[in-house]
Amino acid sequence: MKLLILAVAISLAVLASGSYVPSTKFEAKYADKEFLFKQKFFFEVLRNIHLPLKYDEYIPYTKTWVSDETKYNDFAQVAEFFDYYKTGAFLEKGELFSIYNEQYLRQTYAVFTFLYNSADWDTYYKNMIWARDNINEGMFIYVLHLTVMHRPDLQGIVLPAIYEIYPYYFFNTDVIRTINYKKLYDPKFGFYGNGKYNVVYANYTATYPMDYYNNFYTEEYLNYYTEDIGLNACYYYFMMDYSFLLGGDKFGLIKDRRGELYWYMHQMLLARYNLERMSNYMGTVKPLVWRFPLKTGYFSLLSYWNGVPFKSRDYNYMISDESYFKLDWINAWEAKIRKIIEDGFFVKEDGTRINLRLPESVEFFGNLLNSNVDSVDANYVGYIEVFSRLLLSGNDFNAYKVWPSALMQFETSLRDPVFYQLYERFMDLYYYFKRFLPSYTYEELNFNGVVIKDVTFDKLMTYFDYFDSDVSNVLPMQSTDKYFDYAVFARQRRLNHKPFSYTMNVMSDYTGKAIIRAFVGPKFDRFFDLQFYKKYFFEIDQYLVDFTAGKNTFVRNSRDFYWSVKDRTMYTDLYKKIMLGYNGQEKFALDMSEAHCGFPDRLILPKGWTSGMPMQFYFIITPYTAKTYEQGYQYDKTFTCGVESGMRFYDSLPFGYPFDRVINFNYFYTKNMYFKDVFIFHTEEMKMNQRY
């Protein structure tokens, strides 16, 4: 059956996989009933995840999986899952889950292969229903996201935002308790026609009394940023798109340069975090030093669904005597990495040498540290990333049961200030590797005949506004008739910026396609200081342009930026749109308006200062060059992110170019580059983004 109904219209579209571009015109695509049935299914099975399914149409499939081996693509893998599950060793429903546990990781992968290898939608659908009622809830959510993101037949499926599927990982305990309290004492709560009545205000940790929660560390001033639900969801989706469980020819993640992208994602997170620190008059983050007691503690105010709080880490934290062997392993693995960088090569188990003095070897290096499936020898450095998180969480990799901290969940990792210190330490390995690569030559930087004459900006303004999230999933409902007839919202104050545009004037002797890259970073006094400050430049935009001979003027709006995505539609609202489409009452557009694969548009600018924070934008124009991988599957940019396609990025230049290598100032500054001084102003006036 055809998946899509094609209609000519003006639609919301994407310029690239990670961006939401509302101004592009092309042939829009609308979902047919088969597609909308799938959409309806996912929204319903994710409702009230800790309760058994109550939909009559699903209940017959909750008791057993599809056992017919002809219904699977790789039954040998599926049979392994069947045998494994029958042992009774699987994590029980209701227990705390983290992927950073050896047994849970193996079980998660087994469930994934079972569902991924379901040969058709009917088999997948029935097996997913069985898994919904029989697999641990945390594991189920993890596997459902993996299959939806990576099964080719589910391209374009939109899931509810992760912070609305599982609000426990995004909203502090007092919010959850207040909602349940109101529901307990007011049966009409959530059903009133006046939606304002159903709002609960959600505070950040820093707004609570410091002495009560012992949160005296200065990092708490950044809670509005580190606890931002969009930022934390962004990291979750990246770690799921490029899950370390997946790889090889079957998935083709290597086509997206996953190893290099792993480094770059964390570098950009650190750059953006440091810009926010500068906005709050704080110094840049320093690399973690494996010396105990560790000053940086963390007391999360999150709790798991059963009321168990996230495991905390005391200030001046000491590891147990039994954990020092992990520290020895981490230090040994790190020493191995430094040695192969210095040696300039790595010898694989079969004797093949990998030359680490080639720029493309960054791919090998990233996969090695991530210990993912595409690593040529993950055992060489063990699981340095995993064990580092566990050591800082007071947990064991092979424990029978876990009490996870914020570092042990993708959704909450960015909340813990030690995350940034840890990855700054990892990034030091990356910078050390890059030191051995030659600086870019004049020819590699210059674009003959292209001169950026000037760039002008609108006034850059940031502010806090209120945003509502649908957190109805924390309320247990007994009747499916009521599942989507009520809605409860958590209202939170979030950083935002006024949309802005910049205008670039370029003189060109060149005719053809080119790429413009844009970064925002700190203002520095001397040009030579760029060697130090370049790692704090955050890439906000990258786009393809057509040059004609003579003067070219490009106007770019912040809403069109390549790397960013807009806020998501709320769970209940989106479900109602799906049902209107399913019942034939209106068309359901397939576009990137619900994209998960990008940085929150609201956060592309740091907060700045009320008096104006001096910053710089950096631009570079480069010729358009062919991408390394052209043979990935042909994804549709109108409604998918293109993970595994090898077509997500415009060219094959290194991520972060030209700041990714040591700068030779003898010829670095070329005419196709431009630094623009700006000020970012912060206003205390609240801009209300309310639903009602």
From Swiss-Prot:
Signal peptide stretch: 1-18
Cell wall biogenesis/degradation keyword on record: no
Tissues and organs where the protein is expressed, per its UniProt entry: Larval fat body.
Pfam families for this protein: Hemocyanin_C (PF03723), Hemocyanin_M (PF00372), Hemocyanin_N (PF03722)
GO molecular function annotation: nutrient reservoir activity
Family the UniProt entry places it in: Belongs to the hemocyanin family.
Assigned keywords, A-Z: Glycoprotein, Secreted, Signal, Storage protein
InterPro entries: Di-copper_centre_dom_sf, Hemocyanin/hexamerin, Hemocyanin/hexamerin_mid_dom, Hemocyanin_C, Hemocyanin_C_sf, Hemocyanin_N, Hemocyanin_N_sf, Ig_E-set
GO CC list: extracellular region
Organism listed in the record: Anopheles gambiae (African malaria mosquito)
Protein name stated in the entry: Hexamerin-1.1
Main function: Larval storage protein (LSP) which may serve as a store of amino acids for synthesis of adult proteins.
UniProt subunit comment: Homohexamer.
Glycosylated residues in this chain: 203
Localization: Secreted, Extracellular space
